[in-house]
Curated annotation (Swiss-Prot):
This is Alkyl hydroperoxide reductase AhpD. Disulfide bonds join 130-133. Its EC number is 1.11.1.28. It comes from the Bacteria. Antioxidant protein with alkyl hydroperoxidase activity. Required for the reduction of the AhpC active site cysteine residues and for the regeneration of the AhpC enzyme activity.
Length: 175
């Protein structure tokens, strides 16, 4: 189970994704923990079992158990908060004065460096399409000292993983 397995499973029409996935997994401007946490969190966010399984199994040999749990926690909590804040945004401010009333304790105590958790949350929020959360997480990341290049790299990883998941979802229908 690995990135290589995902690359091999991609059809020819997804060759660009195959190349991009290989490039980003070999190393980036992110630390190994930032990179693999972003890969795990975004793989979980795609809801594609094959993509998640392959990435998670390789990441388990790189990330600490705490970082692996935190990456999955980022995907889970963002699944909830992205829907809430994106949905509230559709209501033109009519509900902005009300408390969400949602537990989000993992955001304050993720079990890993908070900037890593924010990076993973940012990447998942891009997949989930919540521009409020994307903007909020980007601001926190920049204030924490991450560079524009690091933030953009997480965005790029999210885009690649989402593309890989979409391409692999079509393969069974082609046979």
């Amino acid at each position: 189970m690995s990135i290589e397995n995902l690359k091999e499973a991609l059809p020819e029409y997804a060759k660009d994704l195959k190349l991009n996935l290989g490039t980003v997994a070999r190393g980036t401007v992110l630390s190994q923990s930032q990179l693999w946490g972003t890969l795990v969190a975004t793989a979980a966010a795609t809801r594609n079992e094959q993509v998640f399984k392959e990435i998670r199994e390789e990441a388990a040999g790189i990330l600490t158990p705490e970082a692996l749990d935190a990456a999955l926690g980022a995907a889970s909590i963002m699944a909830m908060t992205n829907v809430f804040y994106r949905g509230r945004g559709f209501l033109d401010g009519a509900y902005d004065d009300l408390r969400p009333g949602l537990r989000m304790n993992i955001i304050g105590n993720p079990g890993v460096d908070k900037s890593e958790f924010e990076l993973w949350s940012f990447a998942v929020s891009t997949i989930n399409g919540c521009h409020y959360c994307v903007g909020s997480h980007e601001k926190v990341l920049r204030e924490a000292g991450l560079t524009r290049e690091q933030v953009l790299e997480a965005l790029k990883i999210a885009a690649i993983v989402a593309g890989v998941a979409q391409a692999l979802a079509t393969v069974p229908a082609l046979v």
